[in-house]
Curated annotation (Swiss-Prot):
Coiled-coil features, chain-numbered ranges: 157-269
InterPro entries membership: Mps2
A Pfam family the protein falls into: MPS2
Compartments, as annotated in UniProt: Nucleus membrane; Cytoplasm, Cytoskeleton, Microtubule organizing center, Spindle pole body
Keyword entries, A-Z: Coiled coil, Cytoplasm, Cytoskeleton, Membrane, Nucleus, Transmembrane, Transmembrane helix
Lineage of the species this protein comes from: Eukaryota, Fungi, Dikarya, Ascomycota, Saccharomycotina
UniProt entry tagged with the keyword Transmembrane: yes
Subunit structure, interactors included: Interacts with BBP1, MPS3, and SPC24.
Protein name according to UniProt: Monopolar spindle protein 2
Cellular compartments per GO CC: cytoplasm; nuclear membrane; spindle pole body
Amino acid sequence: MSNGAFDAIFEYAWGQIDKPISGDFIYGKDLPKLIEIIENIFQKAQKSGSYELRLPLFSEINKDLFRTFSNTKTFFKIHKEEFDDIFFNLVNHPLREILENAFIGVDSIPSDFIVSMNLNSPSKFLVENKSKNTEGAGISTSRKKLTESPIKLLSRNNIGKALEVQVEELKRELTAKQSLLQENERQVSELKIRLETYQEKYASIQQRFSDLQKARQVEDNQNSSRTSDPGSPLVTGIDQKAILEEFRRRLQRQTDTISFLKDQIRRERGLNCSNDKVSHSKRKHATTDGDGTFKNFISAVPSNIWVKATIRIIVCFALLAGVLPYIRKYVYAHDTPSQNSRLQLSWWENSGILSKIVWFFEDQTDLETEYRSNANVDDAYSRVFGI
């Protein structure tokens, strides 16, 4: 293994960034640029075809670590003596090992590699730096040991650990996102399968619904044709049963109503039955002789004349009622009633005209009373039969 070849490559890349005015350090923001210069040297060697190399030298994760360090430690001073430790803390491998493993079939960097890439003629700055480093090697080493504090060493370790933690977190996030993506893909596939199943079910249900609609339409058409036929047994049976049932129901209701009204009329008229018989016998006995004459008289006289005559008769009757008692004393003073007579008549019942007038007014009074008593019954009967 040639330490001189590695030192030449490193010094060449370092000299591209480190300026004479800045001393022997670079800033943290220059670390990705330093790595890029080293990688360009090997890419150029591969293009020339002189060597078989494993490229790229650094993985994308390592490059992300370099960029993270440059962003978080922008103005952090990286001294040349501290570079190996910082680099090892970042990628867990020394830079020398990475460069040596890049060559296929060779365990170390070939010595002619430096000559082929023109890396053995260092710049003026490199010569000056080497002379300074050679002259003051002992002084700088002793000074470094004296000035390097435990806090600085601790900060180096903390930087490496922080970067490792960040790398682990990024790996975990990547794994979680990949798992989530796989789960989403699985759910999408399941949803597609369910959607296809529902579409098939919907198509079958729609087909069944259309078949049921067609069957119902056919059934409705058959029922309508049967109903429209007046001679069909179904229509005839329904009509006859409905008509007969309704007729019987109404007839029974009317029969019950008529029977109730008859019973009520009989009860109301039965109270005056005996009085009607007595009055009828009296009227029949007294008015037998003048019955025909009075009927002819009533039919011959107009209604207006009859009203006037009635009023005059009432007045005359009132006068006669006051005079006749005195006349009766003298006319019937010596008459004694017959012992065989079964019915004793009043004095006015012996006269055909007077008895007819009295019985007429009594009949009118009885009819009015009976009409008033049966008014409610007649109204109910009229409402029932719609008269």
